[in-house]
Amino acid sequence: ESLGNIDELNSIIGILLTEKLPDDKKIILEKVQHDLFDIGGELSIPNHIKIDDKKIDFLENKLDAMNNELESLKEFILPGGSKASSYCHLARTVCRRVERNLFNLAQTDKVNEASLKYINRLSDMLFVLARFLNKINHFNDVFWKKDTK
């Protein structure tokens, strides 16, 4: 199940890459696609470790750089905005599913802890990328409105 969900996530990122994106963001996403294949390899081949702290640091640095260009959030936002941002949100939700799958798998099988952390950081990066893409494409974040009944 985990391999299928990783493949689904990778495919959604592939769809996202068909959208007009800044070149530096395309490079990040293409690197992520390769890393997702590596995580699949780790799950398929015993003692095959490809994801490490350097790859996690790469994601965190890119996440922080994009986040520094955005206003801080004080409310929840709804997925949407530009098409590219919507694909980021879709990828983020599948990434969260991958994280749950890997966490559950780790209860019975050996799973690289760095891969779990990478997937967690990837979902955060996809959220920030969605907001960043909305900003550069002149779409506002849509804030969740608490029911005031």
Q: Where in this protein do the model-derived segments appear?
A:
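Phosphate/pyrophosphate-binding loop motifs in nucleotide- or prenyl diphosphate-using proteins
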Residues: 1-149
